[in-house]
UniProtKB/Swiss-Prot annotation:
Stretches that traverse the bilayer: 4-24
Coiled coil (residue ranges): 29-141
Regulation of catalytic or functional activity: Shows preference for transcripts carrying a monophosphate group at the 5' end.
Listed GO MF terms: identical protein binding; RNA binding; RNA endonuclease activity
Annotated source species: Bacillus subtilis (strain 168)
Protein name: Ribonuclease Y
Domain KH residues, every copy: 210-273
Lineage of source species: Bacteria, Bacillati, Bacillota, Bacilli, Bacillales
Subunit annotation: Homodimer. Component of a possible RNA degradosome complex composed of rny, rnjA, rnjB, pnp, pfkA and eno (although rnjA and rnjB's presence is unclear). Interacts with RNA helicase CshA which may also be a member of the RNA degradosome complex. Interacts with full-length dynamin-like protein DynA.
Domain notes for this protein: Has 5 domains: N-terminal transmembrane, coiled-coil, KH, HD and an unnamed conserved C-terminal domain (residues 430-520). Both the N-terminal transmembrane helix and C-terminal domain are required for protein function in vivo.
Keywords of this entry: Cell membrane, Coiled coil, Endonuclease, Hydrolase, Membrane, mRNA processing, Nuclease, RNA-binding, Transmembrane, Transmembrane helix
Amino acid sequence: MTPIMMVLISILLILLGLVVGYFVRKTIAEAKIAGARGAAEQILEDAKRDAEALKKEALLEAKDEIHKLRIDAEQEVRERRNELQKQENRLLQKEENLDRKHEGIDKREAMLEKKDHSLNERQQHIEEMESKVDEMIRMQQSELERISSLTRDEAKQIILERVENELSHDIAIMTKETENRAKEEADKKAKNILSLALQRCAADHVAETTVSVVNLPNDEMKGRIIGREGRNIRTLETLTGIDLIIDDTPEAVILSGFDPIRRETARIALDKLVQDGRIHPARIEEMVEKSRREVDDYIREMGEQTTFEVGVHGLHPDLIKILGRLKFRTSYGQNVLKHSMEVAFLAGLMASELGEDAKLAKRAGLLHDIGKAIDHEVEGSHVEIGVELATKYKEHPVVINSIASHHGDEEPTSIIAVLVAAADALSAARPGARSETLENYIRRLEKLEEISESYEGVEKSFAIQAGREVRIMVKPDSINDLEAHRLARDIRKRIEDELDYPGHIKVTVIRETRAVEYAK
């Protein structure tokens, strides 16, 4: 084979390789294009499905939002309808009150007309008597001049003395009759005012107790509340000062304590712990603190609601909060806040009947026992504390005097002060309103805590077990272990000297030191 032939064969082979490579590359390119087209179509299909899913999800969310908005709108409409109904009821009540006032005014006008007619008759009777006296004087004078040798002046003097004696006797009789009639009318008027006020003021009182019950979902929860070796129940009792009674009562825990605020705090905290399910000392401290804040908010709301219901406005915000604390105070078993509202209504009604300032009378009646809201740490009677509070928050002098005089400590200087004292007596003396035994029991428990907290270094104390035990928390940096034993003996001796109680009282002094560090 010649070189030329070899070159030609090589060229042909190269050309053949190029043609074959061209067709191979074309086939591969077409396959890639077909694959890319299929992938693009798949991506487009997936995008369409995703878009459809997003569209459906957006529609569902829009429907849910529309449903929520519809529910909110319906709720708002119901609330506005209820508010309008309440306003309508208040307007109807005001109309009824105005009608009663008009009737009272008409009755007073009729009474005044009757009295005026009676006075006119008396005046006419007196004038007739004066005419008769003048006639008698003339007759006596003529007779004396005829049969007597007396001078005119002497006869005149004798006649005047005789007439004076007769008139003095008649005037004394008339004065006595007038006084008796005035007393009878005053008694009838007072009884009428009191009966009318009592009939127009109807208030219910529920006897306060010293226990609360917390319902449990099951009896297994009792073991979780007690905790390992009783640490949970001890923590809750220490933080709240309330005694937890866990007995055979199914699905229930009893909270016992004489301080309603502490008992309510413990009840709310225990409810939260049961609902949450996590019960351990750290969680208990957190829930007790939250419960204290909730109780404070509730106290403020009760004060605002009370002022609104009674119709007393313009009270200082601090005084409103103090007023709300009366919700958790009792006097001989009678709730002090309900008692204060009843006194306010009675005083206002009686003031209206007598033409006095009803709003000022309500204000004085509502605040007359405000001193009972202050804890026993502040010295002084509730009257003295109430006067200090009213003076501090610049209340009206009539209100201050009503507080000071409603138990007879001072003389009342206004009719409103007398009405407040009368309303207080009416509310307290109503059968079933008060209970002596419960009040004495609560006073004994308060005295226990007062004695315990009077010593230096004591942080707080709690009377528990129905007054059979008092637990004293002391400051660890102020009292050591030996001083804690001596403090327990001193408190025990003072309790024996100052209190009368059945059985024995256990005095427990607790000194606790904590070291807390945070790992970062």
